[in-house]
Amino acid sequence: MILGVGESPSEGLRKGVVVNLEKTISAIQAAAVAAERMAGQRIESVVVSLGGTHTWSQNSTGVVAVAHPDHEIGEDDVHRVVEASRAISVASDRQVIHVIPRAFTVDGQDGVRDAVGMTGHRLEVETNIITGAQTAVQNVIKCVHGAGFDVEDVACAGLAAGEGVLTSQEIELGVCLVEIGAGTTNVVVYNEGSARHLAVLPVGGNHVTSDIAIGLRTTLDEAESLKLNYGHAVPDVIDQAEKVEVRQVGGDRIQALPRRFLAEIIGPRMVEIFQMAREEVRKTGFDQLLPAGVVVAGGGSRLMGTMDAAQSVFNTSARLGHPIGLAGLADKAYGPSFAVSSGLVKWGAHSRADHSDMRQAVTFGNTYQKTVRWLRDFF
């Protein structure tokens, strides 16, 4: 249940990466204080999202012999085979963030979802391994500790958004999540119950705002207001006679411009974002295997016409991703902007509910634990 919500401008971050420690720490503290005040409780630990184009995914496999004398597969065998899949070449400046099992194979029988309890001699696994830049990960954790909180778990922003807004049926059937943030866009492809591919695009809602500011010669604040109140991702649906008032740079001159002109600035950028996302789907080979279509979330999805643009580019159905499965302050945290944060709440709840160490080992692994211990010693 959601008890409190806090928001703060993400100063100190650029495209999901920390560029100023002090400003990032202050932003975390401001959001936390607001949430604590609303909830009437203190925050001790947090689940943190990792964003930025430094995160990407690759496929891997692992193979082990079943250890038990009766050849019944146990959780320890699953743990070993998942760990075996981690044996990939990773650059010294990168670290494994998540290892996501997709399917197991037992003595040649593939497509096994849960191998525990089955009988076999040879256990194989296909995994999706997500890595990130060590310094980027450490800087995020360092900021959270600097704000006075323990890090309970870490999740890539795209996976957290999926946890927040996707249904289990969509994940099973096949769906593409496009989470449009401020500086980046997360693209995650799901099929048969798991994440198959993750990518972070270097464009987001701030790029749309910047395009408007340049095209209309106005301030970024005015451009953001125009985008949210009058913007549209599909220019052709806007009446050519409709006007919007634009305050020019300097603040003295107000000019009436066609609203369609505003949409003609916005439209190409939104199409570009969806075309880049579609290319990521094509790379996976799942472009024809998305019966559940596309789910668009994030602050950038609040723009009018976004679903129409997504449907046009992907040539499939599209819906707006609202947080689901959370009780409490629904009106405060129901919008698509809360896709990642709502997913982090559910991520943390699942992590606590799982009393074994398997989920932590599978998702973030020993490298994260070493990073957290090092940062605790540092502080």
How should these model regions be labeled?
Residues G251, Q255-L326:
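C-terminal structural cap/anchor segments
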